Amino acid sequence: MDYYYDDYYDEYYDHPDQAAARLFHRDLSIEETIKNCVHPSLRFATQYITNFIAINLLFSVLVLIVRKLFPTAQRSLHLLSCVCGAALVYRVIDHGFYHFLQLAVSLYAVQWTLHRWLTGTGRYIKTPFIVIAYGIGNLLVSELLEPSPETWNRIRGTQMILLMKALSLAFDTDDNHSLRSQLTVLSYSGYILCPANIVLGPWISFNDYLTIWKPPAGIEPKQCRSSSGRRMLIHVFRIVTSALMAVGFLLTSNCMIDYLLAPINSWKWVRAYGRALSFRTSHYFIGYLSQCSMMAAAADWHRAEDERSIMLPVSSLYRITSPMAVEFPRSLVQVVTAWNIPMHLWLKRYIFRTTKRPFGTGTAIALTYIISSLLHGLHYRLWITLLTIGSWTFVEHEVRKKLATIYSACVLVGKCPSSCTVHQHKSNSVFCTVINMLFFALNIFNLIYLGCIFESSEGPPDEVQQDKSMFGPWTELNYASHWLLVFAYLFYFVI
């Protein structure tokens, strides 16, 4: 349930000239579309992406140089991270620095106080949960006190990444005294300000951040030198490919969807499909840009195992989103997992697993939904959307589980192996194909319905408007998915 949050980032690239371009009349020719939309978007994308690539490549090179000259001076990593991260924030975010600063400083102060005074005591509430309560409370109060919604919209994603880092740090250092001993003001600052993910994410753990300094093991120096040229070319290819993918999704979101759907946009479901697809492709833009940023900052790009995949290193740190899994979903569970992979892992590791043992599965799922929603701030549309997604995910899982049991068929949420011995009807049978295709169509329908409420061109959501305008796209579609959800829930009890 780590969903729709990337409309926050659209303020980064939705400049006035681009916003005007996206609102152009749908009868523009291809030449006018290129002139009024593609060119402004390309100019901005070039400037914006260059900041990420240049600063992170500089960070990577400096880490390699300093690590070679001073192999034991790990504090150099933190200093470089602080300087490069601050430079990137200064280049791409022009408002709201004080929100970031006060949240980062206060979260460290809270953790330091709790570690100093509560360590070893028989406390009923663990330190990380106190940090969660404080961090989310600080985030919500800051949003309420910020007079400019536009300013908050520019830093919302950065604040969320900062909070996720600090909360994971609270969990990781709660019982790991060895890791806690490495946590100083300088190392904390370097982790929080790491240029690879300070602005757009993704979240990485404190341990993952520290491995930037460690040289790759298992590679002989001569072997490393002999193949370093090839590996460098692969590394550059990956960075360029990710950047081009990001630009492609940005142009698709800003320009091409409107142009291609213009002849048939009089039908409300086509308009809803266009809005939802524009939103999803804007998310893919952010995902591939953050992937590009992470790879540009990878000081250990020459690891031998990275050659197994030319598009992405083996490490899951670099895989942010999977458009194919989202656009062609077997189930909504697959969409939830593939939408934002690092955030899904964060919620699973630190919220769901931590609360499942003491409170049970049901409570753990509810708490995961609540934390996921609150991390995004006061975004009521998103809260309702996440609740709808969670409800659909549960109903789909239970219905398919019942159908698989009754008919002994491979129609579960997860795909059965080709040599499945549990079910009589295999995945390639006619019955299973029909059932799975019906759920595929249902999930495509839900992607349209749930995504159309977010428009990447609308800027920050105006949550003070009446519910009718807030959920206008759903009203236009007669709340079809919600009625279908009720029917599916009743069907679950009937079968």
UniProtKB/Swiss-Prot annotation:
<feature type="transmembrane region" description="Helical">
    <location>
        <begin position="92"/>
        <end position="112"/>
    </location>
</feature>
<dbReference type="InterPro" id="IPR004299">
    <property type="entry name" value="MBOAT_fam"/>
</dbReference>
<feature type="active site">
    <location>
        <position position="376"/>
    </location>
</feature>
<comment type="function">
    <text>Protein-serine O-palmitoleoyltransferase that acts as a key regulator of the Wnt signaling pathway by mediating the attachment of palmitoleate, a 16-carbon monounsaturated fatty acid (C16:1(9Z)), to Wnt proteins. Serine palmitoleoylation of WNT proteins is required for efficient binding to frizzled receptors.</text>
</comment>
<feature type="transmembrane region" description="Helical">
    <location>
        <begin position="46"/>
        <end position="66"/>
    </location>
</feature>
<keyword id="KW-0879">Wnt signaling pathway</keyword>
<dbReference type="GO" id="GO:0061355">
    <property type="term" value="P:Wnt protein secretion"/>
</dbReference>
<comment type="similarity">
    <text>Belongs to the membrane-bound acyltransferase family. Porcupine subfamily.</text>
</comment>
<feature type="transmembrane region" description="Helical">
    <location>
        <begin position="434"/>
        <end position="454"/>
    </location>
</feature>
<keyword id="KW-0472">Membrane</keyword>
<keyword id="KW-1133">Transmembrane helix</keyword>
<feature type="transmembrane region" description="Helical">
    <location>
        <begin position="184"/>
        <end position="204"/>
    </location>
</feature>
<dbReference type="GO" id="GO:0016020">
    <property type="term" value="C:membrane"/>
</dbReference>
<dbReference type="GO" id="GO:0030258">
    <property type="term" value="P:lipid modification"/>
</dbReference>
<keyword id="KW-0256">Endoplasmic reticulum</keyword>
<dbReference type="GO" id="GO:0045234">
    <property type="term" value="P:protein palmitoleylation"/>
</dbReference>
<dbReference type="Pfam" id="PF03062">
    <property type="entry name" value="MBOAT"/>
</dbReference>
<dbReference type="GO" id="GO:1990698">
    <property type="term" value="F:palmitoleoyltransferase activity"/>
</dbReference>
<dbReference type="GO" id="GO:0005783">
    <property type="term" value="C:endoplasmic reticulum"/>
</dbReference>
<feature type="transmembrane region" description="Helical">
    <location>
        <begin position="403"/>
        <end position="422"/>
    </location>
</feature>
<dbReference type="GO" id="GO:0005789">
    <property type="term" value="C:endoplasmic reticulum membrane"/>
</dbReference>
<keyword id="KW-0812">Transmembrane</keyword>
<feature type="transmembrane region" description="Helical">
    <location>
        <begin position="358"/>
        <end position="378"/>
    </location>
</feature>
<dbReference type="GO" id="GO:0017147">
    <property type="term" value="F:Wnt-protein binding"/>
</dbReference>
<dbReference type="InterPro" id="IPR049941">
    <property type="entry name" value="LPLAT_7/PORCN-like"/>
</dbReference>
<feature type="transmembrane region" description="Helical">
    <location>
        <begin position="475"/>
        <end position="495"/>
    </location>
</feature>
<keyword id="KW-0012">Acyltransferase</keyword>
<dbReference type="GO" id="GO:0016055">
    <property type="term" value="P:Wnt signaling pathway"/>
</dbReference>
<keyword id="KW-0808">Transferase</keyword>
<protein>
    <recommendedName>
        <fullName>Protein-serine O-palmitoleoyltransferase porcupine</fullName>
        <ecNumber>2.3.1.250</ecNumber>
    </recommendedName>
</protein>
<feature type="transmembrane region" description="Helical">
    <location>
        <begin position="232"/>
        <end position="252"/>
    </location>
</feature>
<dbReference type="GO" id="GO:0006497">
    <property type="term" value="P:protein lipidation"/>
</dbReference>
